[in-house]
A protein has these predicted regions:
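Bacterial N-terminal signal peptides
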Residues: 12-25
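Class I S-adenosyl-L-methionine-dependent methyltransferase module
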Residues: 39, 43-55, 59-195, 247-370, ...
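Class I SAM-dependent methyltransferase Rossmann-like catalytic core
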Residues: 180-238, 256-260
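Conserved Class I S-adenosyl-L-methionine
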Residues: 311-316, 320, 332, 431-465
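A short acidic, Gly/Pro-enriched loop at the edge of an enzyme's catalytic core
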Residues: 377-389
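A short SAM/SAH-binding and catalytic strip from SAM-dependent methyltransferases
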Residues: 387-401
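A short glycine-rich, Lys/Arg-flanked "PGG" loop and its adjoining helix->strand segment in the class I
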Residues: 404-416
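Conserved beta-strand signature within the Rossmann-like core of class I S-adenosyl-L-methionine
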Residues: 416-425
């Protein structure tokens, strides 16, 4: 028999739970909710062009949601493959450059078998090279005793989630290696022979796993976009920011840096830029980081309670043939000024032409961060409104109908007078955003670095859409 509470306690319980619910509601983002066909009325033409109508809409959204869960798994395993090929922590053997491995693997096949393998015929897959098999074994051994290595701990947890039976892990990773190599070969070698290599690569990205990749360079174009926003309206104030897909720096395809723990830079970069530009003020700013990957969300939730010490470093290394633009160098030099309790350390040469610094995030800055799960294609945060929504380097993963849903969900969360900032260059996004009441206000292209002999500099773009203050 369950004991009954005393009458005093019984009387207090409703008030206690009401206060608890109110506190959670005040500090947590709204629950993810799916849009209805009516909610996406302005972009229904794009959906119909993709074969989706009112009768099939709910089934389509559910299917995309399921596919995105699988794409998250594949994206995580992509990073795991890149890690096991390059890590010096798990093996003293020479690191294997993924694209080089892909080329050797595929071009060892005869013409017919190569074509079958690239079509996805598992029966045509080549054997996994011995040096890769050795690295798979080294990873599985190292993951059993990570010894405080945060990146290895992350991948060990991923192995547990992906392969409940440890006996299946070596074979499972071999299969993932072959899948990743097929994608890399198509991207780096097959697509480059097409009439429009960029379009061919873009099509591949709409089918690949959802990557958590993030880098300091992504923060630079957001910083520039916020500068444009401030210049257009100096009195503008930003109190609530939603970052869609902040990501986590785990294991890039090239240049794995194991000198620092995995980190999600974008929330801190956005916080720093909003404060340093004067768009927001400490204590009156909330950053909501929403990601489809639950491991990214968990990482950022911990960061709120345990403010990180960021190793901020450009992924580009200066050399006689590569020069960082003065504006980008200045951004790296100034990064973190609004994040630290004291004065942020100056940037310096970290060796091998890499520029960076260490920034200790203050407890006050960390308290501005919230993390929540969200699939922006199929979901929106119910009842939430934001002064600014940022989505960089995630929109290329979506085809046109998926992009229409993502833009509709973003638009539903932009407050009147609010802004949407992204770096997706497909023209259709301008049409979709305008249809949802977010017309393009300005765009800017920014040079990050110049490369001797290259046809064009390394650059990125930023596009700023603003909803009229009187919502249509």
């Amino acid at each position: 028999m369950i004991p009954r509470p005393s009458s005093r306690l019984a009387a207090a319980l409703p008030a206690f739970f009401a206060a608890l619910v109110a506190a959670i509601s005040a500090t947590s983002p709204g629950e993810p909710a799916r849009a209805s066909w009516r909610d996406v009325a302005p972009v229904q033409a794009t959906l119909r062009a993709g074969g989706i109508d009112e009768a099939s809409f709910d089934v389509y959204v559910a299917r995309v949601g399921e596919e995105n869960v699988q794409r998250v798994r594949e994206g995580d395993l992509d990073h795991l493959v890149y890690y096991l090929l390059q890590s010096s922590r798990i093996s003293s053997a020479a690191a294997i450059e993924p694209a080089v491995s892909a080329r050797r693997l595929v071009e060892s096949l005869d013409t017919d078998r190569r074509a079958a393998y690239l079509r996805g015929d598992r029966g045509a897959a080549p054997p996994v090279p011995p040096e890769v098999t050795a690295r798979i074994a080294a990873l599985l051994k190292a993951a059993q005793a990570p010894r405080g290595d945060a990146r290895l701990t992350y991948f060990g947890a991923l192995l547990d989630a992906a392969y409940a039976d440890p006996r299946t892990r070596a074979a499972g990773l071999a299969t993932e290696y072959l899948r990743v190599m097929r994608f890399l070969y198509e991207k780096e070698f097959v697509a480059q022979r097409e009439a429009s290599p960029a379009a061919a690569v873009a099509e591949l990205y709409r089918r690949r796993g959802l990557s958590t990749d993030t880098a300091v360079e992504a923060g630079y174009v957001v910083h520039l976009g916020l500068g444009v926003l401030k210049a257009l309206e100096p009195a503008r104030r930003v109190r609530r920011v939603l970052i869609v897909g902040p990501g986590l720096d785990l294991a890039p395809r090239t240049g794995l840096d194991e000198s620092a723990a995995p980190e999600s830079y974008q929330p801190w970069a956005v916080l720093d830029s909003v404060l340093s530009s004067g768009l927001g003020t400490p204590g009156d700013l909330e950053i909501v980081a929403a990601d489809i990957n639950p491991r990214v969300v968990a990482h950022l939730a911990r960061a709120r309670e345990q403010p990180p010490r960021l190793r901020v470093a450009s992924s580009l290394h200066e050399s006689p043939s590569l020069s960082l633009s003065p504006e980008y160098r200045d951004y790296v030099d100034r990064f973190g000024g609004a994040l630290s309790a004291g004065t942020a350390a100056p940037a310096r040469d970290l060796g091998d032409g890499q520029r960076g610094k260490t920034v200790a995030v203050s407890a006050q800055a960390a308290r501005a961060l919230r993390a929540t799960p969200l699939d922006i294609v199929t979901q929106r945060l119910d009842g939430e409104r934001f002064d600014l929504i940022i989505a960089t380097n995630i929109l290329p993963y979506f085809d046109d109908p998926q992009l229409a849903l993502a833009v509709a969900n973003i638009a539903a969360m932009v407050t009147p007078g609010g802004a949407f900032l992204h770096n997706e260059q497909r023209p259709i996004i301008g049409d979709l955003a305008a249809a949802m009441g977010l017309p393009l206000q300005q765009s800017r292209h920014a040079v990050i670095a110049t490369v001797t002999g290259a046809k064009a500099p390394l650059y990125d773009s930023v596009f700023l859409h603003v909803r009229p203050a009187a919502a249509p």
